[in-house]
Amino acid sequence: MPIFGINNAMVPILAYNYGAGHKDRIHKTIKLSVMYAVTIMLLGLATFQLIPDKLLLLFNASDDMLSLGVYALRIVSLSYIFAGFCIIISSVCQAFGHGLYSLYISIGRQVVVLIPAAFILSKIGGLNLVWFSFPMAEIVAVLLSAFFLKKSLSSLKFDNTAEKTA
């Protein structure tokens, strides 16, 4: 949830600085937003790797649920490493009027990779392998995010006089 707060703060900052022609501030805002988001997600990853059982016990998990849930949380949380970057970049694309790029990232993650990977992995190794579809999907989303970030930033038009007067 804190990452969505970062998004909500970042979008108007990007829009303002784009309008003002401050390319350097745009890059700095994106860099800081990604850095904070990835740091937050690394904390989440560490939590789910170190104490998944304690988190599940907050919800009165049975022994069966614990044996299944601890493994699942540890595998799924590996995707957190990549998710922070993807969430921020989706919003960057939207901030610059490239909402379709954000949609492509989301469809790539959910429809093109996650669902087919979960299906295939369930046939190969059952439920234990299904959890790996989440990190797989997020890795593809990172690649798509990087591609669309570059495309989005390269399409921005700046008035060079605005940078000189700022």
Where are the regions that the model predicts?
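Intrinsic disorder in cytosolic terminal tails and internal cytosolic loops
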Residues: 154-166
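Alpha-helical transmembrane segments of multi-pass membrane proteins
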Residues: 3, 63-89
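Hydrophobic alpha-helical interface/terminus motif in multipass membrane transporters
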Residues: 14, 55-56, 93, 120-121, ...
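Membrane-interface helix-loop junctions in multi-pass transport and translocation proteins
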Residues: 52, 58, 110-143, 153
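Generic alpha-helical transmembrane segments of integral inner-membrane proteins
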Residues: 38-50, 81, 85, 111-116, ...
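Short membrane-interface helical motifs at transmembrane helix boundaries
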Residues: 43-66, 70
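Small-residue-rich hydrophobic transmembrane alpha-helices
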Residues: 1-46, 50-52, 83-102
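Residue-level recognition of transmembrane alpha-helices
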Residues: 37, 73-76, 80, 106-107, ...
